[in-house]
Amino acid sequence: PPHHSSAASDVYKRQGIIGAATAYFMSKEGRKVKVIERDPTYKTASFPLSLGGFRRQFFQKENILLGKFAREFIFQIPELLKTEKNPNPTASMVPNGYLLMFGPDHAEEQYRALENHKECEAGTKNIKGSELKKYFPYINEEGIETATFTDNKSEGWIDPFLFHSALKHKAIDLGAEFIKGEVKSLSEINAKTIISAAGCWTKELLEDIPVVPQKHTVFRV
């Protein structure tokens, strides 16, 4: 690929929904942004395979707060991401609470997580396994020590491809430039700030960064 030279204020990244989101937020702050994408069709990208869930039931406070921010952002997509060419952006949001169930071996860890939920005002409800049928009569409570869930306005899922498209179009509207190409070495890039959004391909570019691919399997029933 050609050498990408530009002013020192430029920011460079690589493809996918993280790249599009970063381009949006950086462009919104007035930064000059270029995104280098290996495959603009996203045929091998991770995000189109995602179920697109947004939730706040995590252990780490940072993840809980990120989940809360994601919810607020997603609910405002029609306003935040609209452009002249895309006046009605959507991510096909489906608000729906998440139910997480824990057996005796993992209940104690979840009780500790609930302390962070409370501190971060996650709005999580906690019940005993024996109470499950009161709320969810179709679930077998056998072997369940505790369960947590939220209401339908706190969590849910979106169409990740539509979300990416809305982010990308808004970033472009704000001045970001998306370039088809592949970065083989950081020496090819002349920029003040370089952000890698290569995901599971990170080690191909940054061998010293401890990011490795991990296979995930999803079953839809």
Model-flagged regions — what are they?
Residues 28-47:
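Glycine-rich FAD pyrophosphate-binding loop
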Residues 23, 27, 170:
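Gly/Ala-rich phosphate-binding loop of Rossmann-like dinucleotide-binding domains
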Residues 43, 192-221:
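Central helical "cap/lid" subdomain
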Residues 150-186, 192-193, 197, 203:
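Helical element adjacent to the flavin cofactor pocket in flavoenzyme catalytic cores
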Residues 14-16:
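Glycine-rich Rossmann-fold phosphate-binding loop(s) that bind the pyrophosphate
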Residues 19:
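N-terminal Rossmann-fold NAD(P) dinucleotide-binding loop
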Residues 1-8, 12:
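Single conserved hydrophobic/aromatic residue that forms the stacking wall/gate
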